[in-house]
From Swiss-Prot:
Receptor for SLIT1 and SLIT2 that mediates cellular responses to molecular guidance cues in cellular migration, including axonal navigation at the ventral midline of the neural tube and projection of axons to different regions during neuronal development. Interaction with the intracellular domain of FLRT3 mediates axon attraction towards cells expressing NTN1. In axon growth cones, the silencing of the attractive effect of NTN1 by SLIT2 may require the formation of a ROBO1-DCC complex. Residues 68-164, 170-257, 262-346, 351-446, 455-541 form the Ig-like C2-type domain. Glycans are attached at N160, N463, N790, N820, N827. The lineage of its organism: Eukaryota, Metazoa, Chordata, Craniata, Vertebrata. GO terms for molecular function: axon guidance receptor activity; identical protein binding; LRR domain binding. This is Roundabout homolog 1. Residues 1147-1163, 1384-1397, 1602-1614 have a biased composition (Low complexity). The modification Phosphoserine is found at S940, S1055, S1297. Residues 1322-1336, 1642-1651 have a biased composition (Acidic residues). It comes from Rattus norvegicus (Rat). The gene is Robo1. Keywords: Cell membrane, Cell projection, Chemotaxis, Developmental protein, Differentiation, Disulfide bond, Glycoprotein, Immunoglobulin domain, Membrane, Neurogenesis, Phosphoprotein, Receptor, Repeat, Signal, Transmembrane, Transmembrane helix, Ubl conjugation.
Amino acid sequence: MKWKHLPLLVMISLLTLSKKHLLLAQLIPDPEDLERGNDNGTPAPTSDNDDNSLGYTGSRLRQEDFPPRIVEHPSDLIVSKGEPATLNCKAEGRPTPTIEWYKGGERVETDKDDPRSHRMLLPSGSLFFLRIVHGRKSRPDEGVYICVARNYLGEAVSHNASLEVAILRDDFRQNPSDVMVAVGEPAVMECQPPRGHPEPTISWKKDGSPLDDKDERITIRGGKLMITYTRKSDAGKYVCVGTNMVGERESKVADVTVLERPSFVKRPSNLAVTVDDSAEFKCEARGDPVPTFGWRKDDGELPKSRYEIRDDHTLKIRKVTAGDMGSYTCVAENMVGKAEASATLTVQEPPHFVVKPRDQVVALGRTVTFQCEATGNPQPAIFWRREGSQNLLFSYQPPQSSSRFSVSQTGDLTVTNVQRSDVGYYICQTLNVAGSIITKAYLEVTDVIADRPPPVIRQGPVNQTVAVDGTLTLSCVATGSPVPTILWRKDGVLVSTQDSRIKQLESGVLQIRYAKLGDTGRYTCTASTPSGEATWSAYIEVQEFGVPVQPPRPTDPNLIPSAPSKPEVTDVSKNTVTLLWQPNLNSGATPTSYIIEAFSHASGSSWQTVAENVKTETFAIKGLKPNAIYLFLVRAANAYGISDPSQISDPVKTQDVPPTTQGVDHKQVQRELGNVVLHLHNPTILSSSSVEVHWTVDQQSQYIQGYKILYRPSGASHGESEWLVFEVRTPTKNSVVIPDLRKGVNYEIKARPFFNEFQGADSEIKFAKTLEERPSAPPRSVTVSKNDGNGTAILVTWQPPPEDTQNGMVQEYKVWCLGNETRYHINKTVDGSTFSVVIPFLVPGIRYSVEVAASTGAGPGVKSEPQFIQLDSHGNPVSPEDQVSLAQQISDVVKQPAFIAGIGAACWIILMVFSIWLYRHRKKRNGLSSTYAGIRKVPSFTFTPTVTYQRGGEAVSSGGRPGLLNISEPATQPWLADTWPNTGNSHNDCSINCCTASNGNSDSNLTTYSRPADCIANYNNQLDNKQTNLMLPESTVYGDVDLSNKINEMKTFNSPNLKDGRFVNPSGQPTPYATTQLIQANLINNMNNGGGDSSEKHWKPPGQQKQEVAPIQYNIMEQNKLNKDYRANDTILPTIPYNHSYDQNTGGSYNSSDRGSSTSGSQGHKKGARTPKAPKQGGMNWADLLPPPPAHPPPHSNSEEYSMSVDESYDQEMPCPVPPARMYLQQDELEEEEAERGPTPPVRGAASSPAAVSYSHQSTATLTPSPQEELQPMLQDCPEDLGHMPHPPDRRRQPVSPPPPPRPISPPHTYGYISGPLVSDMDTDAPEEEEDEADMEVAKMQTRRLLLRGLEQTPASSVGDLESSVTGSMINGWGSASEEDNISSGRSSVSSSDGSFFTDADFAQAVAAAAEYAGLKVARRQMQDAAGRRHFHASQCPRPTSPVSTDSNMSAAVIQKARPTKKQKHQPGHLRREAYTDDLPPPPVPPPAIKSPSVQSKAQLEARPIMGPKLASIEARADRSSDRKGGSYKGREALDGRQVTDLRTSPGDPREAQEQPNEGKARGTKTAKRDLPPAKTHLIPEDILPYCRPTFPTSNNPRDPSSSSSMSSRGSGSRQREQANVGRRNMAEMQVLGGFERGDENNEELEETES
């Protein structure tokens, strides 16, 4: 946009406008654009590539300018005090924006404001500080800054940038302290630097030099310096250094002293002395500092007054006693540690007997054992000898198989297989270094006794309580060999059976009758055999009288467990035997516990209970004697009792003492173990819980049985804990892994050899620290509270985790204070010795969660449970119930980026779905742009415009669409909403019931059509199909017609290229169809180039006798002839169906051309959607409006290719000729109807131009010759030909390919009319109807005069609202043209807002006959033509109503007529037909210029039936019923059933027609139009034109009245009623029907109901 065209004042004012005003200002049109506009001030249209699609261009003020944008944002700065600083900010914009700085919301003063200011605003927009001013009280430069860039288009704000002044205080918050550690121990120094900003970093210096932190032993973490393994070289002076950008600060000096633990130079040795001797232990150690020495006794105190410690640290004990024996430890200790060395003092003591042997009596052959046990120090050796014998038996001697004598390790003498010679004394002697003692015992041998186990009591007595005088029964069942003897004892006294009350049965049961109180006591059953005895006891209580006694409940044997299996021995040791058994689950109850009994001769002669209440099936019996034979049995028990005993186990012998320990010299063992020296290596750390220990033995000994590894935690925190022992019993091993250690703990470890109870000297102590792990428990007692010192700070406190879960040394604690957004997060880290932290600067209103975790060297551990806190605006904590409010939770969720992204994505998806739906909806609307206006609102009708095409070298105006019509395709036609199948070619009935044969076919065969064009199309299609054996669908009835692809075929044309009623393309050739002239041009080019498929066969009748064909058929054939004239090289050009493209050379199909039209008549209805049901009509039927056939057929030329004779076209067995599959409509039809009905109104939105069809809301006229002159000859021809149609033989063609899909056309005489009533006009009153009648009659006369003069007529009446009709503002105007001008009449002056479609008068005269034929009384006026013949002005042929027509703006004059009442009864069908036939005028005479080879005879026309008013009235009622039902499908069927399209028949042979006078009406001549007399003012019923009712052939018998399976239920009653004889209707019937009034319909309804 050029600025020079705008006033300067506007430019200045625009600089101050906001963005919103600028957008409005951009819509100001440019003056040059206004000058280029139309004269009336409308904006000039822009070119296709213009960005402005509104048709005008707006002002673009300073198009190159744009608002500011920050390209470089300032960043945070930390500057030292007094130092210069720069905050960068760069912005771009046009004009160049100005930059200002703000701090804390206030504008920053720079040198531009005050030259003395230390702040400078650089040209780039950066803010430069000459120096940073910062004091204790005044801090002018510190704060948060933003830069703002502005120009007249707006402003841009940068990000926040904080400028902070760096500080570093002098005093350290914590100075490192002196450290004193031992070599090998870790050293830790802690330092907290001075407060500063930014937080200073920490480094260390040693002896004035930076500390080398590359040493892997040295770790600097936070303020801590850790040396893991100190050396002597680590000693020195250490300084902590804190550094930030201000400088550095040094802490106080800390001394690190590395000391040495004590280590022994000479360890004490084990000693063995005799009683009353002295014992000395020497000890010598070194260390730094020099250690101090001490002695202690491990298991007691040093003997008082008998020990001394010499200056050389030697321990001396005088007069040693046996109590002094033990382990003595030398302790060397200094300030960094201590060392210990132990030695054992052994005091030798003379032996003494502990167990002396006793005399034994044993049976011959048995085994006997003498026990002898002695103690002493050292342990005395025991040996046996038989008195009088020198053979000694020692315990350490290996057993000899030939000897029956042996001595156990404990000193017991055992004699097996005793013989009588073994009788005598046996001497036990014990001996050690301190002395010896002797004892003896006598062995007596008796007779042989069976070596059997003692008896076993299977079931013994149970405790009982009985009343006085009650009966007691005590059972005792025992087994043994021999049978055991059972005795009963009471409280240890044998029960006497002399008392008559007491009786012992043979089975051993003891029975006591008449019990007394004295019978109370413990009863014992003893079962005895020579091998031993068994006992079982029970307590019996006798109660006095009056005391309730619970009698013993008899025990069910099934409730007691069964005996377990025989126990098996699984393991045997010196004093332990392990048994295994299984319960008996096959019988008895499940046991809950077990009882184990054992027997051994070494322990006595009876069974002993060794274990009770055993819960498992395996048990280890301990405490057994070594080298003894044992027998075992097991009993099962539960709450109900004890089971029988199991089988006795096999004998098992416990192990003897190992022979290696026999005969050992204790002093020698102790001496050798004391000389063993172990060297322990540094332990290897394997994991956090295991350490591997290695050692070497300097001096091996045969008495090393194993090693004991002793370990314990070390450190002050653990104190002097006890040593833990891990034994290694393999002398050859020199390493072991100690498991189950604590994590991160320092251990001290040592090793010690041992032999039985003897132990050697300890090795040196080694230290090992297990690996650390993260703490496995969170800190305890975490609390969050308000800090008193700061308004927005909180105090977090905690306690360390439990020690066993720390898994190392806690080095620090991490504190997380998390807000609901990351910008509010605050994290803190404190030292491991700190248990609280203050977190400042919390944002009020933000809910924080605080978590604490302890951190070791392995990292942070488990976090504590979140503690929530929220501060209000005053800094006070909010109560917990308020913290987690629903609003806060919702706010937290809404602020989450994921939620925002999800909402955005959902909105985008919804928008895309809606856009797709809207696009598809609009696309369907555009696709339905070929639908007629109001197709979804009111059943209406649209007629076909006049189209010119070439015929025989001259332009001929066709009243129909110049397109192929074919209904022979399957039921997939896009123009049918409820596509019902057509009849197949197997049907013999004629396609249109125009002359119902005498076979009696009634209305059941009636085929309903949506429009007269459908009837005409089907008439010709069926004729062609009869000739070609085309396969047709099954049904004869169609539903709603989908006209979505046909709107472009219904257009009016107004173009200078219209010549003589023909459209002439720029090349001079007439175009058959205005909207498809480009396609026709391509077709012409294609035909000239030999286009088309030469192999495609064309329709050609067989060479048989020709019959004359109706002019309708001739019109189609003539057009086919025209198309064939375009062929080149005899190549046949297939005609194009309306809804299919011919091929790629056709230039596009009619369908594609129509879609592009975007006419406004589509109303956005979907393709294929069923149209709504027709509203009520006042008895009107569109069949009344169907015009007669043309009176002047075109001349015959090459008729064998384009048409067929009557012989070829008609089947002898058919009631009427079959329509051809392809047909064109003829101009003459329009001419003869135009004169009768007035000018043809166009469909809205259609226009024509020489090059293409233009679509707009401007009105165009239709060049249509007035067809009024053509009406009277049809009136004359029709009655003679009706009902007398001959039946020529069947002539069929053989098709090569199926015909293209059908394209319905509107007949020329109906183009542009509205056939359906307005929805708003359905329920009008009778007075309004009378007024409309008067208006219609006045308009008729006026329109008649206009038509005679060939003038334009502008409609003036409003025809309904926009909801249910197409208003005049949305459609084109129309007008008629005089033929003498040969040019288009001017555009109609229809206003875009007048809301009219056509005049009431013109429409009224077109529907007058329809109204009266339907049973309405209409004021009729007769008119006289040039010849003086009287005729009616309205059309006489009935025309069916179309439910899908776009003529939704029917004139109110027609709609609002009241239904006539019936005045007289119906006459019989034949009478009616005769009466009507007699009153018909003679047929017309065709002009000589047009000759038809196939004109039907008058007799043929007479043979055709007509459509009676009964059908019309019935259909009208069906229409009203369907409207009341709200458009239900049933109503729809009723609507479809009554839409009968009657095809007009041909007027007869043209030769006869030429001979008959035309009474001054010469069709196609201008004179005839000028000379028409004024219209008659009244019409008479006799002038109603008869019309044929169409029908389809059915799949049944041609004469089967039920072949129409898809007929409407509304029409079925009428068809059944007339089935007997309605094949043809005579003229008398029509005459009677024409006189119907309102009452006729009522009677008809009664008749229909009765039928």
